């Protein structure tokens, strides 16, 4: 079985931006993050489960989309730790003779491959209280590289034994995995395609890696700018003309723009669009009143 663990709401920084939503429901490239996460497992012939907070209300659109994707929702009691949440989900739905894959809801990879028992790891990118790969994990490696963190994707050949290990480790998910590895050692897979959506700063950085361009547009993001060109030259020239003729009084509301004959570069701002906030967020009405003032 495949389990995406998204049973805890995103942090307060995300609540300020989008309202109260679980990490798998964050907007990414005109979709929700869960659509990209599920796509990673398209060639796995396994049942798919997504855990959510018990009081989270699914929209009709998300209900329909998740049904189309053959994903079963597991509503988990609020305020459980990660280890408690995983044990709850596995006790509800796991077939213990099947292999188990776990992907954290605030995690995405451009590429993902597993071994029988494996941990995806990545080099640390931000100053945060990460779960590090240390010598308490039993692996075939003789030495463990410094500054490697658990990147949020795991495979287990014996899920029932994993439950036992987590429970005996006072429901600590990480300590439970360390105990599990004493019997079933983990292969370590260093994955440089990891994108983190657990911190608001890394969220905006990760968003840049997923393009929203249409087929006739070319978009490149680098050095703080988005360069846009297109095979539809009339459209690009019309956009350049719009920027060139913008009244100076409005410059404080627009990003910096560098225009060329057949393309332009626009400053990349770490802001969400109104479309993302409206379609994917759960903002209260008073926030929208303030926006439109």
Predicted ranges, named:
Residues 178-191, 209:
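Catalytic donor-sugar/metal-binding loop of nucleotide-sugar-dependent glycosyltransferases
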Residues 108-182:
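Conserved core of the sugar-phosphate nucleotidyltransferase
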Residues 58-134:
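Conserved beta-loop-beta/alpha segment of the NTase-like Rossmann-fold superfamily
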Residues 214-245, 251, 260-262, 267-268, ...:
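ATP-binding glycine-rich loop module of kinase domains
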Residues 12, 54-61, 234-237:
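Short, charged/polar "capping" segments at the starts of alpha-helices
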Residues 31-46:
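A short, N-terminal amphipathic alpha-helix
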Residues 1-21:
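N-terminal nucleotide-binding beta1-loop-alpha1 segment
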